[in-house]
């Protein structure tokens, strides 16, 4: 016990923002018998455990009334009898969408199929027949990605399908920034792929007192018109509910003007190639003054492209001579190491929300999404507490938490008051999927080998 406490105190001098302590790369185990709640700053400050600073999940999110009224007015004036079916079809299509297959991957698959056909002695192959067989097999086994062109009609369907869920996901991301950095008061925001303008509304709900300029960029003219109507309560005239909103169809490439917050929500997946995504992420980071917020569907495809964007920024390939400050991961990762979940389940989160009260909507709903928030500066500025990556499983006298730890590893922790201390146990019990657990996870401790306690 004394040796463990000495090790904990020694490790406390290691700056948690700088990554893994130099002693070892072992799993960040929650060691029984050692109180590891991060008390160095008196984090509870006489508050109850249910209000510990790692709690970040929002209650049910609701659209601003002006936005909900505008959406209902637009839909009542334009929707046909098949709107419900169109909404369901588009929702399913967007959720199940994969990334476009890159040319190099297509060539690799074609060579593999050609080799497979040539190895079959029962097939007499001419060069023309072989080429036809390979193409036929490729068409059957390759995802056919198509670019969506948002006309006036499709933009309206998208609004009915995604306005409320998109607002909920972005609100959760913005809430994390505000909760962990309450002194941050942005004045400018740029939204790439702005669509219906849900990012602008979510940002106004969080930082409406400080934001003075919102730049909305979307290549669809019809979508920009729809977003502007929503700002005016669903009409083409009148004063916008949020002042200082500007619309344009093309992304400004000049790095001279930066925005305090830059956002891309459900837009990187709409780009036709990895090269296009790389170019856009580089441009977005150059335009970022403080925070770059990227949000996508909580699927393997969405998580994968967000990790590509994260790695691109962290490797520093897009450094601008006008702003040489490095980037670090503000959320959700408590580290800058490779994602330990990339080969398994998608790292996703869930936000409950009240949908727009259309006839087909049921209450409440959950928006499942993946996100990454990148910030300029030093990792020392961010919390390095473990992130809860799955729903917390509460059982009598113990609780299961799946954690992404600051050393870049996943841990399934089974916590009890007797083995881990009352503070840590109570904090874990009141925490939810997506929260931070205010606990020190020194990598010098060996992984816990204790078995899960009986659930009887």
Swiss-Prot record:
Range annotated as the organelle transit peptide: 1-19
Q: What is the effect of changing residue 347 to S?
A: Abolished iron-sulfur-binding, leading to impaired ability to promote mitochondrial ribosome assembly
Q: List where in the cell it is found.
A: Mitochondrion matrix
InterPro entries per the UniProt record, alphabetical: Mt_RNA_Methyltransferase, Ribosomal_Rsm22-like, SAM-dependent_MTases_sf
- Could you describe the subunit structure of this protein? Associates with the mitochondrial ribosome (mitoribosome).
Instruction: Please state what the annotation says regarding this protein's domains.
Output: [4Fe-4S] cluster-binding is essential for its ability to promote assembly of the mitochondrial ribosome (mitoribosome).
User: What is the similarity comment for this entry?
Assistant: Belongs to the methyltransferase superfamily. Rsm22 family.
The protein's name? Ribosome assembly protein METTL17, mitochondrial
Give the encoding gene's name. Answer: METTL17
